[in-house]
């Protein structure tokens, strides 16, 4: 409750001014579950302009949605006016938002009962939709009619399965049936929003359970490039996903599991940044090389430690090995390399030009590469004079 106490002065101040105010959302849910608390959000009957008038230190980030960031005790908190939402457009956003003075009206528009619990500053729960019961049963249940909730915002179906992965809960029967019925509506949702949820699914503690739900509800068939992947997705549930430390590894392993032959094309379809695509593809390519042979100095040097560590964890998952020392071994091998990158070489193109008395040309870059590999393999010491002598001995000058 420590973090809530830091923010409780906001609620107390709002109440002193005649308004209602409560802690709401994921932070309350995680407090009940005893999980680490993320952002703490506050809902209030005060209108945005009233919130801004009460708290001089504020940032008006989303006034059209009723949200003001209030800075209290050096921490930012989202304070949002109670609201209801009208008819939804395109199965993803309300056509308009109405501010209301009723907590119940605000909570009933939320997605799942576990996320529709409010809490007073004293820690008393206001649970109008049996959210605590759902948490106790470890069930994901929609607020009200599941069909209505998913037709309002189809992304809620992905969120539901993402919560399976992060919390280990199960989809309540009617909620699961509604996902099977309305899964096609996910095709109206921007792929960027789906990608965010899917990445949280892949990196969750209970990823395997969530992937099974993705198959059982047939929701996977409405995702880009996954329409024909039922058997491969089931294959992915047979592996241990616990060893990954980054989302890059999780995506690389997922692409391996589904047998994706054109990973860059797949990832572009899912709207990844070029940098992320490059890293994921690099991990996959390195894993392929790793399957053919163990690490050697040249492979490790060319790969770099960042990609090598991730590739080793993916490789270990692929071969279903639980040798937690393998990444440590890669780190030790890398630290023993004579140089870690080309910038550490004690020779330059100018040195070669001076020694050879030849005109500049492609031969300089080729020679630098030969020297680089020789240093990495331990064939020559990384000292200027030693390199010159080695070149002469090899008749390369």
Curated annotation (Swiss-Prot):
Keywords: ATP-binding, Magnesium, Metal-binding, Nucleotide-binding, Nucleotidyltransferase, RNA repair, RNA-binding, Transferase, tRNA processing
Coiled-coil blocks: none
Cofactor or coenzyme needed: Mg(2+)
Pfam families membership: PolyA_pol, PolyA_pol_RNAbd, tRNA_NucTran2_2
GO term, biological process aspect, one: RNA repair
Miscellaneous section: A single active site specifically recognizes both ATP and CTP and is responsible for their addition.
Protein name per its UniProtKB record: CCA-adding enzyme
Lineage of origin: Bacteria, Bacillati, Bacillota, Bacilli, Bacillales
């Amino acid at each position: 409750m420590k973090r809530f106490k830091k923010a409780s002065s906001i609620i107390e101040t709002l109440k002193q001014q005649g308004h209602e105010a409560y802690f709401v959302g994921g932070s309350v849910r995680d407090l009940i579950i005893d999980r680490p608390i993320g952002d703490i959000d506050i809902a209030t009957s005060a209108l945005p302009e009233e919130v801004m008038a009460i708290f001089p230190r504020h940032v008006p980030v989303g006034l059209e949605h009723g949200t003001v960031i209030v800075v209290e005790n050096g921490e930012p908190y989202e304070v949002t006016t109670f609201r209801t939402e009208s008819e939804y457009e395109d199965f993803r956003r309300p056509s308009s938002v109405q501010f209301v003075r009723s907590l119940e009206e605000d909570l009933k528009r939320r997605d799942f009962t576990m996320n529709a619990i409010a809490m007073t500053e004293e820690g008393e729960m206001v649970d109008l939709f049996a959210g605590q019961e759902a948490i106790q049963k470890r069930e994901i249940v929609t607020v009200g009619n599941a069909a209505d909730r998913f037709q309002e915002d189809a992304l809620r179906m992905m969120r539901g399965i993402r919560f399976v992965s992060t919390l280990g809960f199960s989809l309540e029967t009617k909620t699961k049936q509604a996902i099977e019925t309305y899964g096609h509506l996910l095709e109206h949702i921007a792929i960027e929003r789906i990608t965010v949820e899917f990445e949280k699914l892949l990196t969750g503690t209970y990823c395997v359970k969530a992937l099974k739900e993705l198959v059982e509800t047939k929701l996977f068939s409405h995702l880009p490039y996954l329409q024909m992947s039922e058997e491969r997705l089931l294959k992915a549930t047979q592996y241990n996903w616990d060893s990954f430390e980054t989302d890059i590894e999780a995506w690389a392993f997922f692409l391996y599991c589904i047998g994706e032959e054109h990973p860059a094309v797949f990832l572009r379809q899912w709207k990844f940044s070029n940098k992320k695509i490059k890293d994921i593809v690099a991990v996959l390519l390195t894993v392929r090389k790793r399957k053919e042979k163990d690490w050697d100095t040249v492979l490790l040097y060319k790969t770099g430690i960042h990609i090598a560590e991730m590739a080793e964890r993916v490789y270990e998952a692929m071969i279903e090995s639980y040798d937690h020392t393998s990444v440590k071994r890669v780190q030790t091998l890398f630290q023993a390399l004579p140089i870690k990158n080309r910038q550490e070489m004690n020779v330059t193109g100018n040195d070669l030009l001076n020694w050879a008395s030849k005109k500049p040309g492609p031969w300089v870059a080729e020679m630098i590469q030969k020297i680089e590999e020789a240093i990495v393999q331990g064939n020559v010491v990384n000292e200027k004079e030693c390199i010159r002598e080695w070149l002469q001995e090899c008749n390369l000058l």
